Amino acid sequence: MGKKYFGTDGVRGQTNSFPMTAENALRLGMAAGRYFVRHTGRHSVVIGKDTRLSGYMIESALVAGFTSVGMDVFQFGPLPTPAVALMTRSLRADLGVMITASHNPYHDNGMKLFGPDGRKLDDKAELEIEALMDGSLVDGLAAPSDLGRAKRVDDAQARYVEIVKSSFPRAQRLSNLRLVVDCANGAGYKVAPAALWELGADVIPIGVEPNGFNVNEECGSTAPARLSKEVIKYRADLGIALDGDGDRVVLCDEKGRVIDGDQILGLLAGHWQDIGELRHPAIVSTVMSNLGLEQYLAGRGIALERTRVGDRYVSERMRETGINLGGEASGHIVMPDYSPTGDGLIAALQVLRVLGDSGKRASELLKVFKPAPQLLENVRVPRGRKPLESEAVKAAIAEAEVRMGVAGRLVVRASGTEPVVRVMAEGEQKLIRSVVDDVRGAIETVAQG
């Protein structure tokens, strides 16, 4: 059964359009509240958000929904997604909600939900909440004397900074390191520079002037060109770029070269194996991770388990198998020993830990493997259109897979967070260009028809 409101990473869409309306946020608060209010006593939910203007509207609607069914609400204000997950667990809340559209532009927004363990809800829970949203919610309203209360938590950012610092070895400091950190004008704009500075680094912050409209605008992990320039300009040792909600990271070495999540996974897997912290000879990533990573890991006797795209699915596989390292090429790095969900800042600190242990420059360590030639294109489609169900598109994909043979890979998937179809091919350079062009053309023809 397909989902109506939830995608691969919560509910997401353009503000004031389905499903991201104030009415749906209100109904989600009421429905999720009913789902988690299953026994007597007080119940609570924590809410954080990034820096989008629409966050105020969505937050107000959620608060009204939760309090109407008897849940107390703790409001954090701007705070990274992983902080909300951690604080859900720390405050013994029934539920956590992060208001964000992650790496999307300001005009989009979304709602990510976390259970009491700080982990994202599974498909079953999301489907049950959707059913409640579409039903009558009147029966779940609290009596006037049992309404929930809303309270702002002023020290949430300071609490998270302490949690982040505790993930870094106490005997190690970042003294003598100059770091440029790009916070994408997003949720990490205060906490990321603060944590790095308190650990002793010389911090040059950029992307720390949010105005409600500039989140992810030519900055952050999806647009690292500025970070690269600033690293070279200030002769920094490392550049760190977060996305709008702080759950993913890409890096930049001292020469300005961008390092993606696959390279970070390769570095950490090898280092953790060497020091005995890799619990199993395997890590988890998605179908989008580069073939070069898989080959590098195989050379070290480490298996790469692939899942569908989405850090939630990576986390689920890790829980099933007991694997303690996983992530995505986009920069979600999942380390359950430190955080129940992807945390860009903690991942960056793990890389800095390796740099400190090795005494080497970032450029010497962070090109772990030679990536296989890869081409990824996003084909925009009108909302509601499903070109991948077209026989013409299916035929184009089948023909492309035959042409790729066993020497390459082709992945075609609809995004769960944006109205695009992603077409990714790996293999010989000229072949993947031709294959992607053909598949893209078939999708565009159907989408525009």
UniProtKB/Swiss-Prot annotation:
Catalysed reactions, as listed in the record: alpha-D-glucosamine 1-phosphate = D-glucosamine 6-phosphate
Record EC number: 5.4.2.10
TM helices/strands, residue ranges: none
Cross-referenced PANTHER family: PHOSPHOGLUCOMUTASE (ALPHA-D-GLUCOSE-1,6-BISPHOSPHATE-DEPENDENT), PHOSPHOHEXOSE MUTASE
Superkingdom as given in the UniProt entry: Bacteria
Binding-site positions, Mg(2+): 102, 243, 245, 247
Cofactor note: Binds 1 Mg(2+) ion per subunit.
Protein name: Phosphoglucosamine mutase
Pfam families xrefs: PGM_PMM_I, PGM_PMM_II, PGM_PMM_III, PGM_PMM_IV
Names of required cofactors: Mg(2+)
GO biological process: carbohydrate metabolic process; peptidoglycan biosynthetic process; UDP-N-acetylglucosamine biosynthetic process
Record's keyword annotation contains Isomerase: yes
Alphabetized UniProt keyword annotations: Isomerase, Magnesium, Metal-binding, Phosphoprotein
Source organism per UniProt: Maricaulis maris (strain MCS10) (Caulobacter maris)
